[in-house]
UniProtKB/Swiss-Prot annotation:
The cytoplasmic region is essential for the fusiogenic function. The 17 amino acids long immunosuppressive region is present in many retroviral envelope proteins. Synthetic peptides derived from this relatively conserved sequence inhibit immune function in vitro and in vivo. Residues 465-538 are cytoplasmic. The lineage of its organism: Eukaryota, Metazoa, Chordata, Craniata, Vertebrata. Residues 320-340 are annotated as: Fusion peptide. Residues 501-538 are annotated as: Disordered. Pfam families: TLV_coat. Residues 1-20 form the signal peptide. This endogenous retroviral envelope protein has retained its original fusogenic properties and participates in trophoblast fusion and the formation of a syncytium during placenta morphogenesis. May recognize and induce fusion through binding of SLC1A4 and SLC1A5. This is Syncytin-1. It comes from the Eukaryota. One of its GO terms (cellular component) is plasma membrane. Ortholog of the human HERV-W_7q21.2 envelope protein. The genome contains a high percentage of proviral-like elements, also called endogenous retroviruses (ERVs) that are the genomic traces of ancient infections of the germline by exogenous retroviruses. Although most of these elements are defective, some have conserved a functional envelope (env) gene, most probably diverted by the host for its benefit.
Length: 538
């Protein structure tokens, strides 16, 4: 998990410390290695740099680490540099930063998403997260669900900063210059939750590096992780003392830093693996190259965003901003062809805007992701609470789910547009709150009417169908009985019934079942009946 992306993160309230100010931090280094590294970057063909003493002595620079494992120190105390609190302690392990017995400084919080193993950085973060959750649990929902939650405390935390306005204006200018789509009126949204930064490697032909160190603080360690790397060819790679493979086909240019801690100019970062660094200590286990960093953004048209907020969410979204420009920009950066000046300058300026936020990482006390998780776990009771937050509170940012959106046109950010859509959302919410039973029925009538006819037919069929079926069955049965009665006399007229006495002797030549025999009635009338008694008396 990496750092969230916009400056909302860096405007959170600082923790409350005791009234007694901590002592000043004493972790200073010289800027000479930085100047030597700049010389090597401008003279990549020269193996031997001028004598180290020929460089200016440099100004003392405060150095702090972004991560310090718990097993590197026995105890840590607070110190202060530039109105910012740091931890300081003596190293007890030779493999720790600085080495055995060296006193070093590290940031109040560790690199986001990492743990120091139960040390002072973890304790500080846990303490602040509890404070944030305690504040959020005091926020409660009132009246109708469409009003959502009173997240005024969160909104104060996420107030717009001038750096964000500058970041958007820079992005919009570059988008107009290098994008084929060239959007003129749209909503540009920055994520509140985690989404990877995008790494744009510095092209070989570009040498517009700053020649002066412009920071009084050096943060040694990763500033952001889980980068989205656009391409891995034609890279400007860094050769350290322990680098063995200098024939990597991905690298088209090599630069060699000194062994001391070295920092890059504002807007340029070391990318080692999937992590970005501002400063390195002269060694790295993985291959490192120079890169710009740009924030991820989502772009909506006016209608798409209104449909998303007012009606129902839609899954269709345009690509993240850097990939909107991919066809015209990344191809040029990758092949090294001409026409890259405009796009490279854009990415450099955008990366510088981002760098201003990176340097404030030590001032941020908790990531916005932690706050969002706290809201979801404690008080976020309906999905549309953040969507409707701007209908209840002021601000120039329109909260859309887990994104913060700004309306932009050719002139830059238009804050009035946020108020306009906020009013539309508020009117829509009022309509939903004030709607009565008959009003709700009238709203559903256009959807119900097409189904009323078939539905009524089905109901009538279920009610009267059995009766109609029984009537049909009875009618058919009566007709069948009538036909049977008409056919019965004709059948009887064609049938003869024969009778004979029970003691009539069976004739060997005649039988009652023999159709060729003589019927008993006809025999009795044709000849006298012979009886056995009369024959014996004669």
């Amino acid at each position: 998990m990496a750092l969230p992306y916009h400056i909302f993160l860096f405007t959170v309230l600082l923790p409350s410390f005791t009234l007694t100010a901590p002592p000043p931090c004493r972790c200073m280094t010289s800027s000479s290695p930085y100047q030597e590294f700049l010389w090597r970057m401008h003279h990549p063909g020269n193996i031997d740099a001028p004598s180290y003493r020929s460089f200016s002595k440099g100004t003392p620079t405060f150095t702090a680490h972004t991560h310090m494992p718990r097993n590197c120190y026995n105890s840590a105390t607070l110190c202060m540099h530039g109105n910012t609190h740091y931890w300081t302690g003596k190293m007890i392990n030779p493999s720790c930063p600085g080495g055995l017995g060296v006193t070093v400084c590290w940031t109040y919080f560790t690199h986001t998403g990492m743990s120091d193993g139960g040390g002072v950085q973890d304790e500080a973060r846990e303490k602040h997260v509890k404070e944030v959750i305690s504040q959020l649990t005091q926020v409660h929902s009132t009246s109708s669900p469409y009003k959502g939650l009173d997240l005024s405390k969160l909104h104060e935390t996420l107030r717009t900063h001038t750096r964000l306005v500058s970041l958007f204006n820079t992005t919009l200018t570059g988008l107009h210059e290098v994008s084929a789509q060239n959007p003129t009126n749209c909503w540009m949204c920055l994520p509140l939750a985690f989404r990877p930064y995008v790494s744009i490697p510095v092209p070989e032909q570009w040498n517009n590096f700053s020649t002066e160190i412009n920071t009084t603080s050096v943060l040694v360690g990763p500033l952001v992780s889980n980068l989205e790397i656009t391409h891995t060819s034609n890279l400007t790679c860094v050769k350290f003392s322990n680098t063995t493979n200098t024939t990597n086909s991905q690298c088209i240019r090599w630069v060699t830093p000194p062994t001391q801690v070295v920092c890059l100019p504002s807007g340029i970062f070391f990318v080692c693996g999937t992590s970005a660094y501002r400063c390195l200590n002269g060694s790295s286990e993985s291959m490192c190259f120079l890169s710009f960093l740009v924030p991820p953004m989502t772009i909506y048209t006016e209608q798409d965003l209104y449909n998303y907020v007012v009606s129902k969410p839609r899954n269709k979204r345009v690509p993240i901003l850097p990939f909107v420009m991919a066809a015209g920009v990344l191809g040029a950066l990758g092949t090294g062809i001409g026409g890259i000046t405009t796009s490279t300058q854009f990415y450099y300026k955008l990366s510088q805007e981002l760098n201003g936020d990176m340097e404030r990482v030590a001032d941020s006390l908790v990531t916005l992701q932690d706050q969002l998780n706290s809201i979801a776990a404690v008080v976020l009771q309906n999905r549309r609470a953040l969507d409707l937050l701007t209908a209840e509170r002021g601000g120039t940012c329109l909260f859309l789910g887990e994104e913060c959106c700004y309306y932009v046109n050719q002139s830059g950010i238009v804050t009035e547009k946020v108020k306009e859509i906020r009013d539309r959302i508020q009117r829509r919410a009022e309509e939903l709150r004030n709607i009565g039973p008959w009003g709700l029925f009238s709203q559903w009538m256009p959807w119900i009417l097409p189904f009323l006819g078939p539905l009524a037919a089905i109901i009538l069929l279920l009610l009267f169908g059995p009766c109609i079926f029984n009537l049909l069955v009875n009618f058919v049965s009566s007709r069948i009985e009538a036909v049977k009665l008409q056919m019965e006399p004709k059948m009887q007229s064609k049938t003869k019934i024969y009778h004979r006495p029970l003691d009539w002797p069976a004739s060997p030549r005649s039988d009652v079942n023999d159709i060729k025999g003589t019927p008993p009635e006809e025999i009795s009338t044709a000849q006298p009946l012979l009886r056995p008694n009369s024959a014996g008396s004669s």
